[in-house]
Structures are given as structure tokens and as C-alpha cells.
């Protein structure tokens, strides 16, 4: 038995190792291509450093920012605002979306006002919000909440509405309560839409955060970029953009994506073949 199981186990282990390698290398390929083009452009086209800084200058700036402590200070400040605004947006959007999704008449009544406010970009609120909230964390949190809320709200409402009613009727026919129907049918069915809304909302939350910090904040990655622009330090500007992108990718691939996969699998919303991968 062990002689037969060993080759199978070895094959399975090799496949998992290959999948992990592919999971890392394939998404990295476009970044490598951009890096190569960037290096070739600065080497052969030789634009001014203010127009396109060399890769070495950007890396040197990141090192200097890290050693001086500025990088950690700005990253922590931005992450604090992002997480606070996103958590508020996710919670309120999820609760509101589920409630509206469960009541089609309520959904029809609220749809016009949701479309109205969703069409107004968070940036448009800046002049008024600066008057109300001042410049600082409260302003950034509001803009992030305003961005994340509508994305999660609409995805949650849509996910709930698309759950087939026959599933709900089946649970109720077996004597299930309203809460049991919600827990075993509605939430699992809407879960893929909700999680997609969360991931998308966080991505747009970064944009709202940087916009708020550009307007005015003592610390933060947006503030760092804006200050660098005043001194024509394009190397720090590019460094700030790279840092934002790297943090966003890390959050998505090592936090949000694993949570999404585990949660969806827990509710049995993937095929058995996918579970084995």
C-alpha cells in the first residue's frame, strides 16, 4: 500500500509546488516587462530625471526613506486611514445591502437616491467636507467610506437578490426559520458578490485615500508624493506610487484573496476539483 501511495503523494506534492511557483511567477511577468522597458528607456532615450527617473534613483530614494523612518511613518498613517474608512464602508455597505436586497420594494424605492449619490465622485465632496471636517484624518476616512460603501452596498444587494427563491422556499418547507434561511442560503449565495465588492472597494479606497492626503495631511503616502512634486523629486513620486502598488497587491493576494477562497470553499461554492488544487 505504501509503495503505491508514495508516487501519488510525490506527484501531488510536485503539483502543489508547481502551482505555488506559477501563482508567484505568472503575475510577476508583466511587472518584469515594465521594469525592462523602463530601464531601456532611461538608458537609451536618456530623458531628464524629472521626466523619468532611472530605476536606480528610485530604489535609492526608497532606501533613504526607509532608513530615515519617513517611509514607515507615512505608510502607517495611510494604512490607518485606509483600514478605518474601509472597515466602516464595508460594515455599513454590507448591512445596508443585505437589508435592501431582502426587500425588493425597498430596493426599488432607494435605487434612485443610491444612483444619485454614487454618481457623485468623492472628490466632488472635498470642498464641502473640508469646511465640515477640516483637513486631516476625518476627511480621508469620509472619502474612503464614501467610496467603499457604495461598491459593497451594491454588490451585497445584487448578490442577495440573485439567490434563487426556490432555495429559500426549500429551507422554509423543512421548517427552517428566517435566520436559518439567511445563514444557510442567502448569505452563502451572496458571498461571492460581497467578497468581490470588498476587494474592489479596497482598491478604489486607495484612490480616495491618496486624493485626500494630496489635499492636506501632515503625514501619509499622498502627502509624501505631493511634497516631492513641489521639489520636482520625480524619483520620490515614482517611489511613492510603487510603494502604494506593492502594499495594495500584498493586501489583495496575501489577505483578501485567501479569505475569499477559504470562505467560499467553506460554504461549498466551488467544485470539488477546485478544492484539490
Model feature map: region roles:
Residues 221-259:
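Hydrophobic alpha-helical transmembrane segments of polytopic membrane proteins
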Residues 142, 146, 178-212, 235, ...:
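Transmembrane alpha-helices
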Residues 53-63, 67, 206, 216-229:
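Short hydrophobic, aromatic-rich alpha-helical segments embedded in or entering the lipid bilayer
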Residues 84-114:
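Transmembrane-helix boundary motif in ABC transporter permease subunits
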Residues 112, 155-197, 221:
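Short cytoplasmic-facing helical segments at TM-TM junctions of multi-pass membrane proteins
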Residues 1-32, 253-277:
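Transmembrane alpha-helical segments of polytopic membrane transport and secretion proteins
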Residues 115-151, 158-162:
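Generic hydrophobic transmembrane alpha-helix motif, especially the helices
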Residues 13-20, 44-88:
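Periplasmic/extracellular loop-to-transmembrane helix junction in inner-membrane transport proteins
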Amino acid at each position: 500500500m505504501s509503495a503505491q501511495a508514495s508516487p501519488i503523494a510525490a506527484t501531488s506534492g510536485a503539483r502543489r509546488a508547481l502551482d505555488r511557483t506559477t501563482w508567484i511567477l505568472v503575475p510577476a511577468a508583466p511587472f518584469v516587462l515594465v521594469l525592462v522597458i523602463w530601464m531601456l528607456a532611461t538608458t537609451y532615450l536618456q530623458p531628464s530625471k524629472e521626466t523619468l527617473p532611472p530605476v536606480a534613483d528610485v530604489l535609492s530614494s526608497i532606501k533613504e526613506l526607509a532608513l530615515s523612518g519617513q517611509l514607515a511613518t507615512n505608510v502607517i498613517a495611510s494604512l490607518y486611514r485606509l483600514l478605518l474608512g474601509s472597515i466602516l464602508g464595508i460594515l455599513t455597505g454590507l448591512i445596508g445591502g443585505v437589508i435592501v436586497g431582502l426587500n425588493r420594494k425597498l430596493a426599488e424605492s432607494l435605487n434612485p437616491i443610491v444612483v444619485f449619490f454614487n454618481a457623485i465622485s468623492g472628490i466632488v465632496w472635498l470642498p464641502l467636507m473640508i469646511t465640515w471636517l477640516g483637513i486631516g484624518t476625518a476627511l480621508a476616512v469620509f472619502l474612503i467610506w464614501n467610496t467603499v460603501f457604495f461598491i459593497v452596498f451594491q454588490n451585497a444587494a445584487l448578490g442577495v437578490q440573485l439567490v434563487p427563491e426556490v432555495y429559500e422556499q426549500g429551507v422554509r418547507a423543512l421548517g427552517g426559520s428566517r435566520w436559518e434561511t439567511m445563514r444557510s442560503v442567502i448569505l452563502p449565495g451572496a458571498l461571492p458578490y460581497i467578497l468581490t465588492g470588498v476587494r474592489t472597494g479596497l482598491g478604489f479606497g486607495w484612490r480616495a485615500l491618496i486624493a485626500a492626503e494630496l489635499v492636506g495631511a501632515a503625514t501619509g503616502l499622498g502627502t509624501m508624493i505631493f511634497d516631492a512634486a513641489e521639489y520636482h523629486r520625480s524619483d520620490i513620486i515614482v517611489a511613492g506610487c510603487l510603494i502604494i502598488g506593492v502594499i495594495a497587491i500584498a493586501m489583495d493576494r496575501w489577505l483578501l484573496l485567501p479569505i475569499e477562497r477559504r470562505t467560499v470553499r467553506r460554504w461549498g461554492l466551488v467544485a470539488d476539483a477546485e478544492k484539490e488544487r
